[in-house]
A protein has these predicted regions:
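Cleavable N-terminal signal peptides of Sec/SRP-targeted secreted and luminal proteins
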Residues: 7-23
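C-terminal capping/lid region of NAD(P)-dependent oxidoreductase domains
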Residues: 28, 319-328, 336-365
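Glycine-rich beta-strand-centered segment in the early N-terminal region that forms part
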Residues: 49-67, 78-121, 365
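NAD(P)H dinucleotide-binding glycine-rich loop of Rossmann-like/cofactor-binding domains
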Residues: 73, 84, 113-176
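Mid-domain Rossmann-like dinucleotide-binding core that forms the NAD(H)/NADP(H) cofactor-binding site
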Residues: 147-223
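Glycine-rich phosphate-binding loop and adjacent beta-alpha segment
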Residues: 203, 248-321, 354-365
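Short amphipathic alpha-helix with an adjacent loop that forms part of the alpha/beta core around
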Residues: 225-235
């Protein structure tokens, strides 16, 4: 009987240990957007390991994330993540600090409501990020609004101030004026005391940009916009162009830009090929063309960008001077539909992904 009792005890212990092992393994897993290279129908939600924390990294429990053009390109195999970064989609996230890695400062604590620029990994339940890139979610802002800030607002801020060097009184031409970056850029131009003109693909999108502060808007589907831009600037042209289109807009951009203008190229939605008398026109107008991206920039550069943004722009979200523009939200399980919507150019502003579908749980861990 004693032997039977011992065997039963051992069996129960084995069962308990096995259950604990399964539970521990499960605790280290998370849901995340996964994909097979191709169309938006190839996106799905799968179980993957939670990210491990490195030196000075914070683990965010993600409430909301968002999608960007870069995500759709990565899904197609055209824009891989930088070396060493997560291959999970998502360049921004909002949530709470779940844990802190070795070497973190005392600036952040577990439970803090934060948003962050990411190099990848945002479309998941947890994401690791350098603590230097964390930003506090402004008072009174929910997670959906917060997820619409990091990638597009920091991109627009970089384009205008770190690269384009926009000055008070200048005029900026913003292509894709109703996109996430576009709606942020329009507001940032006004904040800088400059004037913006936008292009967009519908009157409704132009109306949105104008409501945010754009002085004029032109429908690129209705012919050459460059003469309209010249008319709007009394023949001078614009001082700065924020160009996400590239090749197909070259001639019109060249006509619309002022002498000594700064042309900031950050996307190639219209292709990367141009032909003809390219350099002579640039020389005649003394135009400077700068290509730029943000995702592959160094941590030092991104940290400086985040620090400047927090000082110069973040307070204006609290005052209501600027605001993130949300088009719609999708649950993580419907991320394929979100990609499809973006690729059909249906959105004005941001498409947000809800990982936790209860926007009232602001402090839940």
């Amino acid at each position: 009987m004693v032997e039977v009792h011992v065997l039963v005890q051992r069996y129960i212990l084995c069962v308990l240990l096995s259950a604990h092992a399964v539970s521990s393994a499960t605790d280290k897993m998370m849901r995340a957007a996964q994909f097979e290279k191709g169309g938006p129908e190839n996106l799905y939600v799968g179980e993957v390991a939670r990210p491990a924390l490195g030196e000075r990294q914070a683990l965010i429990k993600v409430h909301t994330s968002a999608i960007n053009r870069a995500d759709t390109l990565q899904r197609k195999g055209l824009y891989p993540p930088p070396p060493g970064e997560s291959d999970i989609l998502g360049l921004e996230a909002a949530g709470v600090v779940d844990s802190l890695g070795p070497g973190c400062s005392e600036k952040w604590k577990i439970g803090d409501r934060v948003m962050s620029l990411l190099s990848g990994g945002g479309n998941s339940e947890y994401v690791a990020t350098p603590e230097q890139l964390l930003m506090p979610i402004p008072e009174g802002m929910d997670y959906i609004q917060a997820a619409a800030i990091p990638e597009v607002w920091l991109t627009a801020y970089q384009l205008l101030h770190f690269v384009g060097k926009v000055q008070t009184g200048e005029t900026v031409l913003i292509h894709g004026g109703a996109s996430g970056v576009g709606t942020a850029a329009v507001q940032l131009v006004s904040l800088a005391g400059a004037k913006s003109i936008v292009t967009a693909g519908s009157e409704a999108k132009i109306a949105t940009a104008v409501s945010l502060g754009a002085s004029k808007g032109f429908n690129y589907k209705e012919g050459d916009f460059s003469q309209k831009v010249l008319d709007a600037t009394n023949g001078k042209g614009v001082d700065v162009i924020l160009d996400c289109v590239g090749g197909s807009y070259y001639e019109q951009n060249m006509n619309a830009i002022a002498v000594d203008g700064r042309w900031v190229l950050y996307g190639l939605m219209g292709g990367g090929t141009i032909s003809g008398d390219v350099f002579a026109k640039l020389l005649r107008k003394r135009v400077s063309v700068t290509g730029t991206t943000l995702r592959a920039r160094s941590l030092e550069y991104k940290s400086q960008l985040v620090g400047s943004f927090m000082q110069e722009v973040l307070p204006h979200f609290i005052s209501g001077k600027v605001k993130p523009i949300i088009f719609t939200t999708f649950p993580l399980e419907k991320i394929g539909d979100a990609h499809k919507m973006m690729e059909e150019n249906k959105n004005t502003g941001k498409i947000v992904i809800e990982v936790i579908q209860d926007r009232d749980k602001k402090d839940e861990l």
